[in-house]
Amino acid sequence: MALLQISEPGMSSAPHQHRLAVGIDLGTTNTLVATVRSGLAVVLDDEAGRSLLPSVVRYRPDGAIDVGYPAQAAQNVDPHNTIVSVKRFMGRGIADIDDIASLPYRFVDAPGMVQLKTAAGVKSPVEISAEILKLMRERAEASMGGELVGAVITVPAYFDDAQRQATKDAAQLAGLNVLRLLNEPTAAAIAYGLDNASEGVYAVYDLGGGTFDISILRLARGVFEVLATNGDSALGGDDFDQRVFCWMLEQGRFAPLSASDARLLLTKARDAKEALTEHSEVRVTAVLSTGEMMDATLTQRDFNAMTASLVAKTLAPTRKALRDAGLAADEVKGVVMVGGSTRMPCIRQAVADFFKQTPLTNLDPDKVVALGAAMQADVLAGNRGGDDWLLLDVIPLSLGLETMGGLTEKVIPRNTTIPTARAQDFTTFKDGQTAMSVHVLQGERELAANCRSLARFELRGIPPMVAGAARIRVTFQVDADGLLAVSAREQSTGVEASIQVKPSYGLADEDITRMLKDAFTHAKDDMYARALNEQIVEAQGLIAATRAALAEDGALLDDAEMAAIEAGIAGLEKLMAGPDHQAIKRGIEALNATTTGFAQRRMDRNVRRAMAGQKLETFD
């Protein structure tokens, strides 16, 4: 919904003026900016008529910054200061970068997000991305003749909180007002759905330079409902380049490469990959700074063989997304191809074989995301009615809390439509407990140790009560950008604590896919472990309550009764050290049975105390 500003009488400034808004596809390899003109979404070109801006930034020794084509031209001669594919570093730590040995950059191992040492000093991926976005803003304002009111920035559907927040920070650093972070497959669906007036179930297969997403959507009467999403936030065209790069090293048997030679071979590898989209073979030549040369022919067949495992890595998440949506491949009406990497013949053939239909490619896969983002920006800026279509996007992984015993309590299940808010009540574990630690988790496993930790905060000021009496309501809120906020409120006093979840860095390579795979693989073991931990927590509570009662009212028992209860406690503690949750359950039942008489005497004694000195009619 667009926000309206109310002006003084006579001071209204063009209430029906078209507001300038854009959609930006901040890609691993290329970045594009688009807008809506006369009702049609168009990609904005630079002065040379080029729509694609290479996502490359160079920091020169003289302090100047090159972005796009000038930077790309320098990547072989100045590899240390020319940053390529910076999107792969967004929201990630140095330990998360698998191919770090082959990269020419000087990484700084700082806490949180990785940083890079350049001629202009240490730079974060947020700062580097901001330079790209700044140039996009300048291109748009020059082309549209005014200042932008805002932009919709697209992100991979599998970007986590840290990666999304890093993208938003980069946009704000570039002077952009972020109207919305929009998932790339959803943006593509907008462009295709409105362009083709389509209805039915569609798959959006999005393979970019550094990320892969698969989304299953239902399009019906202007409603874009994401049924399921899956993918890999560190799989893309760059990985195909790496396979060709390794093949080149085998062909040339070179001495250890300098940074500039490594960048040269990577560039040649990308050129060869792109040439194979149109030809059955390509000649690959290179001359290194050492004078070493290579001259070899790469065939489409060899390329397909060396990259087959990467293609397969895209199909595994596709199967999971279909399973989550409760659909078979033959129930999908069409497959939308997004991202420049989908031009590879091996990708198109694999998708066609999997879905048993020819994928849709009538929109440029490089431009379709930016076009959809521009359409959404036009709505959010208030230039057209928001009832033309409705976006129902989802979160990729469940969100929840750690409870006693190291268990995971899911509050928002994965594939829940966003924006959303869910609340759940929790209580204290110990008598007199006045504080609670809230540990926010992301993942599908039953134990907290197997899920990703997002944030921790404490709620203090809980009034001291017996265990289980306090009521703490924990509320999870996920906004339309997919960003999470969590609050905890003690119901009787109103004391509250909250946190905006901003982890220090994002999910590691394939973490989300791995977390989902582990959840399926270990489901039975996890359920057993959960049952065991639940019984241990219950046993701990019973033992603590029994010992407190013995300390207070042990005089109500004779020696034999006291010994029986102590034996029951000891037996239960021994069972708690074992792996059998059913045995612990039986031990709990046995101790409860042993203490039944003791509990009855305590109750009778307390009733007598309450009635002492009272008249009978008081209790009528």
Curated annotation (Swiss-Prot):
GO terms of biological process kind: iron-sulfur cluster assembly
Entry keyword annotation includes Acyltransferase: no
Alphabetical list of InterPro entries matching this protein: ATPase_NBD (IPR043129), Heat_shock_70_CS (IPR018181), HscA_NBD (IPR042039), HSP70_C_sf (IPR029048), HSP70_peptide-bd_sf (IPR029047), Hsp_70_fam (IPR013126), ISC_FeS_clus_asmbl_HscA (IPR010236)
Keywords: ATP-binding, Chaperone, Nucleotide-binding
Family note: Belongs to the heat shock protein 70 family.
Cross-referenced PANTHER family: HEAT SHOCK PROTEIN 70KDA
Name of the protein in question: Chaperone protein HscA homolog
Organism: Thiobacillus denitrificans (strain ATCC 25259 / T1)
Upper lineage: Bacteria, Pseudomonadati, Pseudomonadota, Betaproteobacteria, Nitrosomonadales
Gene: hscA
